[in-house]
From Swiss-Prot:
Originating species: Histophilus somni (strain 2336) (Haemophilus somnus)
Composition bias, Gly residues: 21-31
InterPro entries noted in UniProt: Ribosomal_uL15 (IPR030878), Ribosomal_uL15/eL18 (IPR021131), Ribosomal_uL15/eL18_sf (IPR036227), Ribosomal_uL15_bac-type (IPR005749), Ribosomal_uL15_CS (IPR001196)
GO molecular function: rRNA binding; structural constituent of ribosome
Subunit-structure text: Part of the 50S ribosomal subunit.
Protein name stated in the entry: Large ribosomal subunit protein uL15
Function: Binds to the 23S rRNA.
Keywords linked to the UniProt accession: Ribonucleoprotein, Ribosomal protein, RNA-binding, rRNA-binding
GO cellular component terms, semicolon-separated: cytosolic large ribosomal subunit
Record-linked HAMAP family: Ribosomal_uL15
GO BP terms: translation
Keyword Ribosomal protein: yes
Sequence similarity: Belongs to the universal ribosomal protein uL15 family.
Designated gene of the protein: rplO
């Protein structure tokens, strides 16, 4: 293999649209923009949601609710992720050390997904009812 023999894979490159290159090209004269009008002009076009001056739908409907910022720092932990932690005591810090959670997470809840094989102690984490039953069935415990 030499540099001068390298080429893109078959079908990987497409020919660019060549606009305004005569009638025979199929994209001559108006270059596929039609005749006159706002959309035919350079920089022409209307913003998303614009309805020609009519009050747009997103302004006709009332505002409601908000997005809780707590959701950005909260995570779910699956039961099978608990096996990735060294030792049998599981806290927020041990989950971060095992790369189960990212460093910006401040709240976590263990959910019933997968299975837990070893007896573990959960400290300072939320636990769902199903996950609690599964952890205690494996010989583990939950501490607040």
């Amino acid at each position: 293999m030499r540099l001068n023999t390298l080429s893109p894979a078959e079908g990987a490159k497409h020919n660019a649209k060549r606009l305004g290159r005569g009638i025979g090209s199929g994209l001559g004269k108006t270059s596929g923009r039609g005749h006159k009008g706002q959309k035919a002009r350079t920089g022409g076009g209307v913003r998303r949601g614009f309805e020609g001056g009519q009050m747009p739908l997103y302004r006709r409907l009332p505002k409601f609710g908000f997005t809780s910022m707590k959701s950005a720092v909260t995570a779910e932990v699956r039961l099978n992720d608990l096996a990735k932690v060294e030792g049998n005591i599981i806290t927020l810090d041990t989950l971060k050390a095992a790369n189960v959670l990212t460093k910006d997470i401040r709240f976590a809840k263990v959910i019933l997904a997968g299975e837990v094989k070893t007896a573990v102690t959960i400290r300072g984490l939320g636990v769902t009812k199903g996950a609690k039953v599964a952890i205690e069935a494996a010989g583990g415990s939950i501490e607040e």
